[in-house]
Amino acid sequence: MATINQLVRKPRAKQVVKSNVPALAACPQKRGVCTRVYTTTPRKPNSALRKVCRVRLTNGFEVTSYIGGEGHNLQEHSVVLIRGGRVKDLPGVRYHTVRGALDCAGVNDRKQARSKYGVKRPKS
């Protein structure tokens, strides 16, 4: 235990919390341009073709972002909005694309959890 005198001379160092989403630079979302849209396979024990895209952000970072939902309209040079949130079974994927924003369309025929997939309220 440090004495009062020692603490007066040299205060305790603050612990620095490391961000899980450094490319967002303390912003809720960031805009970027797709440089590559492709599928990748998850870690064991899961098996699928997960849709992901490589995105060059407005602040210069290049990140990999997951495209949620069934089907998408993204291609190279599409402008997308990125939010934080990793995909547990895809190593290196720490961001999600926001559906229904900018060039990324919402999911077709989506009835439940619509707000997460950029879908307007259906008529009646």
Curated annotation (Swiss-Prot):
Transmembrane residue ranges: none
Keywords: Methylation, Ribonucleoprotein, Ribosomal protein, RNA-binding, rRNA-binding, tRNA-binding
Modification sites for 3-methylthioaspartic acid: D89
PROSITE patterns: RIBOSOMAL_S12
Annotated GO MF terms: rRNA binding; structural constituent of ribosome; tRNA binding
CDD domains named in the record: Ribosomal_S12 (cd03368)
Source organism superkingdom: Bacteria
SUPFAM superfamilies, per database record: Nucleic acid-binding proteins
Keyword Ribosomal protein: yes
Oligomer and partners: Part of the 30S ribosomal subunit. Contacts proteins S8 and S17. May interact with IF1 in the 30S initiation complex.
Function: With S4 and S5 plays an important role in translational accuracy. Interacts with and stabilizes bases of the 16S rRNA that are involved in tRNA selection in the A site and with the mRNA backbone. Located at the interface of the 30S and 50S subunits, it traverses the body of the 30S subunit contacting proteins on the other side and probably holding the rRNA structure together. The combined cluster of proteins S8, S12 and S17 appears to hold together the shoulder and platform of the 30S subunit.
Protein name: Small ribosomal subunit protein uS12
